[in-house]
Amino acid sequence: MSDTSTQAQQVALVTGASRGIGAAIALALAQQGYKVIGTATTDEGAERISKALSAFTGCAGKNLNVNDAAAAEALIDAITKEHGGLHVLVNNAGITRDTLAMRMKDEDWDAVLETNLKAVFRMSRAVIRPMMKQRYGRIISITSVVGASGNAGQANYAAAKAGVAGMTRALARELGSRNITVNGVAPGFIETDMTASLPEDQQKALLSQIPLGHLGKPSDIAHAVAYLASANAAYVTGQELHVNGGMHMA
């Protein structure tokens, strides 16, 4: 599993792939030759993925609620049967329910932990068996700088992402003997529609925290994921790769 021709035989599942970082990851993997299945929470989102990847053979968008364990397992089973295996899982789907802790409702906490932590566990658990059977796999989860440094108003999000980082290390120890690597990529501040709409003073305050002096792009995260999915990262497991322009140095 050492070159693009081999990657063309591999299948990658990317959750939350209809926009932003997820869309960039799906595109980067497709460009590397993977057959990419991207998920979205609506039929419209799934169709957007299919169109974005239409130039690449074997790629498609699928409608999936990652909180539906039965649906997730059914999709993974269908992928392995259709393509003969599943080689890369990228856990990217996530939500936010930001507010200060004193105002945070239980449902805000529960919703974020359910999608950003529990669903990552479920998806990862569901791919373990087929990956063990083929004695090869890459599980890559998108964490966050917030999970390492914290951020006011994001106690739920920080807890979930820190939990994913810990789970990544535990799974890496469990699965390493089966040639399955498990890693995380922790984005810092990335260019989005939201950051673009911030007032100038807020943008300057944001940039002042970043030694490189600019926001990251979704493609920066996608390239990190593509590396961890590749044969070049065969000896990398249990790691959280921070891609944040230096705003947090672990």
Located regions from the model:
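Conserved glycine-rich Rossmann-like NAD(P)H-binding loop of the short-chain dehydrogenase/reductase
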Residues: 32-49
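Short, small/polar-rich loop/turn modules that mediate ligand/substrate recognition or access, typified
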Residues: 176, 181, 217, 236-238, ...
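Conserved glycine-rich cofactor-binding loop
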Residues: 18-20
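Alpha-helical segment proximal to the catalytic Tyr-Lys
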Residues: 129, 173-177, 234
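Substrate-binding pocket helix/loop in short-chain dehydrogenase/reductase
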Residues: 100-101, 105-113, 195, 206
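Short C-terminal tail/terminal secondary-structure segment
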Residues: 2, 149-152, 226, 237-250
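Active-site helix of classical SDR
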Residues: 124, 160, 168
